[in-house]
UniProtKB/Swiss-Prot annotation:
Name listed for the protein in its UniProt record: Tetraacyldisaccharide 4'-kinase
Record's function text: Transfers the gamma-phosphate of ATP to the 4'-position of a tetraacyldisaccharide 1-phosphate intermediate (termed DS-1-P) to form tetraacyldisaccharide 1,4'-bis-phosphate (lipid IVA).
Membrane-spanning intervals of the chain: none
Reaction catalysed by this enzyme: a lipid A disaccharide + ATP = a lipid IVA + ADP + H(+)
Keywords recorded for this protein, A-Z: ATP-binding, Kinase, Lipid A biosynthesis, Lipid biosynthesis, Lipid metabolism, Nucleotide-binding, Transferase
Residues that coordinate or bind ATP: 58-65
E.C. no: 2.7.1.130
Organism, as annotated: Shewanella sp. (strain ANA-3)
Amino acid sequence: MQALVNKIWYEGHPLRWLLLPFSVLFALITAIRRSLFRLGLKSQTALPVPVIVVGNITVGGSGKTPTVIYLIELLRQHGFNPGVISRGYGADIQGVKVVTAVDSAAAVGDEPAMIVARTSVPMVVGAKRVDTAKALLAEFAVDVIICDDGLQHYALGRDIELVVIDGKRGLGNRHLLPAGPLREGAWRLNQVDFVVVNGGPAQANQFEMQLSPSAVLPVNPKAEAVFNPTQPVVAMAGIGHPARFFETLTQQGIQLALSHGFDDHQAYDKHVLCELAASRPLMMTEKDAVKCRDFAQENWWYLAVDAKLSPQFDQQLLSRVRSVAAAKQGKSHGV
């Protein structure tokens, strides 16, 4: 099914024409919803600290999670104490939940589990972004909130919008759902504060980001094995665009005996993965690793990657955060 969807969205499959009437209906519904917020008929909750929303206008992976981790580290390096909120996609969360390092991906979602495992950032997950943001502020002394994937959740007031685009797949056929991959029209890119292009050329007023492999690490934190870079591996990826991960492995000189793409947010079974690997080294993404660490074998590995952005991006982002923070502090003191 996913293969057919990709052909429709990214390869010009003629079935897209049959879906266009539904895309028109989707456009109408989303336009009405935006208008309700713009006209004040639905309320937007403003928060006392800067809110950065990191999202995309397409369905599927684009590199949001590495971008969120980059922002956490950048803000910390410059004296801020950021916190993160997320939906916790794939997890059955009642109300809101504080994410801890011992939480499983099944309990909090794979992206939140990965973000906290990497950064130990204060993080709260839940279905309603406003509730998660309020819980984060009540529980932790954070001075910036990063919302992981909430661009279309307009009830949450935001000060900075950052959109991440897949530089290889772009906006696909540029149609709205379901005929294309767009959640909102391409015009939305002209309204956000920052557009980050992951792994592709950036246009004027956009910023290029590269995901740089940093290390091959064991999925099982107690494993004592040493990775052999000359031994072919079985590669797997349960992300929005598995082919990108397999290409990265090949570029790193890692030989692939077999590659297998799973659905995004796939829940894994130990026996299925053991059968897939067949005693060979198994290589996966960091996002997959947090879902497999409790039952990982000695020769299971993941490739850690770090986002790289330009100093110009850093300067503009920090300047914007400082400006918003100063304005909100002045407002709270009646200045």
